[in-house]
Every structure is written in C-alpha cells, then in structure tokens.
Amino acid sequence: MTPAQGSGDHRTAEGFRNPHDPTTRTLRDVWRWRRTTTPAPWPPWIDDPPQPAPPRLAAGRIAVTFIGHASFLVQVGGRCVLFDPVWSMRASPLSFAGPKRVRAPGQRLEDLPGCDLLLVSHNHYDHMDLPTLRAVRRRWAPPAVTGLGNARHLAKAGLRGARELDWWQHAEVAGLRVTYVPAQHFSARTPWDRNRSLWGGFVLESPDGGTVYFAGDSGWCPYFEQIGRRFPRIDLALIPIGAYAPRFFMRTQHMDPEEAVMAHRALGARRSIGMHFGTFAGLTDEPIEEPEARLTAARPTRACRRRPSPPCPSARRWRSRRLFEQLLLGEGAHRGPHGGGAHRVVADMRAAGDAGIG
C-alpha cells in the first residue's frame, strides 16, 4: 500500500494529521522554545556499559531487553523483534551536531540473539537510524514493517520491500500478527517533508497468546483507550515517559510521566515499562533524572500495595520470572542515580499466563 491509498480522518491531501490535535508547530514556536527556556544540564557521559547478551527463548514466554531510549529487543512467540533500533552516537542527520548519546546502548548489536522482525514506528532520527538499520540488514536481513510513506527511507538502508501499514491495518510477518496502531505525534526528516509519512505504534500478537504493545512517540490522546478495547489482553506495554519539556511545545506530542500512567490504565496492560528518556542530551529540556522521579511518584496506588520487585542489578538475572525493570508503570520499583541501570532491563514472563505477571 502506498500513502495515496490510505484512508481515514488522519489523512490530508499532502499526507497525514492528528485528528485529536488541530495545533501545528511553526518556526516561531521553535524560536520561543530555544530563546525563552533553558534546558537542564545533563552529564556528558554516564558509565553504563553494555550487559551480557540475553539468551534466545522458546515460544511460550515474553522477554524484553531495553537497549535505550525507544530501542527494544522483544522476544515473543519464539521470535526476536527489534523496535526502533538506534545504536548511533547522535539522533541526527549530522555526525557532528544534534542530540548526543550520554550512555552506551544496553547491548552490543552483535551480541543480540537474533532479529527475525524489524519494526520502525516513524521517521524521526531518534527512532529511525539509517546506520543502525544498515547494520541490522547486514547481520540478519529481517523483514521490516513501518507506517505509510516510510519504506522509502528504509530502502536507503538496504531494507527493500518493507511492509507499509496504515493505522489499524495488520500483517502476518515472521509468524507474528503485527498491527500498526494510532499515535498522536508527527513525522519529519527534513524541513520539507513534515507529516508526509505516517507515525504510530505496534501491537504484536503471537500464536502462543502473548501480546506486546509499543507506543512509539505519542502525546496523551483517546487512542490509548481505543487500543485497549481492541486488544484487551496486552501482556506488556512499552510507553514513553520523557522528552516532555517545555510543555507548551511538547504537550501534544510527548507524554509526561503522569500521562504515561494514565495511558497504562487506559490500555489495561498487565505490565508497562517506561521508555524514551535519559539517553540523548539536547532532545528535551527536563533534567535527566526527572522522568524517573515523577514516574515513581505517579505510579498507580493499587500497584504500590503489591510487594515490589527488586531492582535489576545486571542482565545476568535474565531467567528470573519476575519483572525487574525499575521503570514499571504498574508496580513498585527502584530508581538509581541518573537512571543507573535503566538500560539493563530484563523481563521474562509467560505469555498468556500468570507466572511472573501478578
């Protein structure tokens, strides 16, 4: 399907729009952001070295490794799926300017147990990194799925034949059912192609009953309730919590931690993990540690009554049946200094079962 073949109230003559957000950002808004606010200082580098490689798991379990920012390796249905992989030092078209990484990816790309499917939510540089995509293609040559209008970018990385989906469309790829779901955001890789390609998230469903939701980028909007109604058994949701400051500029495009908890509740997910924070300096104005602190304060009350999971000291505890990520939206958690250990995320749970979930 090409962009011209798409339909729905998110379509325009030139591309796409947000049906629930009529506002548009102009150069004047960018000027106001850059000239009237002062970004919080971030540390130049955090010593958070890559962790040992996770094993490849058989079907019947869901496992997730947080690479950093919005990059994840998810194992579901016996398949290894990469979401929005970015291993580059900058989330930028330029190697010498733009948002810069302050901590290493949580895993070396070459140490991953595989990649059977590649999912790219939208075309922003902190989600679609062509050097990383080229490396993924050279090593595994996986099939790729993305939103309408984005396959041309993936082709530049050698990933030809990527499957493009409109919102709510699905495809059977690599033995999994992949549904592209709505998000409230925008797209652009240059000043001239804003909203010419589609943005969104993904729901993965495996034959063994496991269901994983990846939000991509989104502001708070009615889509979370809609996704929860269409997919009432989401085992694991990956939800952004950072890049929300200043609010006058980011509010409709990026959720803050309190809104992320609202999204967790609206989705009805059994577990949710916070993402999109603490990795690239220059992407946002908030302090590096603030998303975690605000998330800790905002977690659902009912979850805090549960016996909290211990923090994950290292990815060596991979086989644990508990969810050790300290950024759980739905359970008590631990927060280290400057997000310490935030890239050492380990989750291993039974698909469509209660072990390690409750």
Which residues fall in each region the model found?
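Active-site metal-binding loops of divalent metal-dependent hydrolases
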Residues: P85-W87, N123, A183-H185, G216-S218, ...
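Catalytic core of the metallo-beta-lactamase
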Residues: F72-G77, E172-I234, R251, M255-E259
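Cap/insert and terminal regions of metallo-dependent hydrolase folds
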Residues: T2-P19, L109, L117, P143-R152, ...
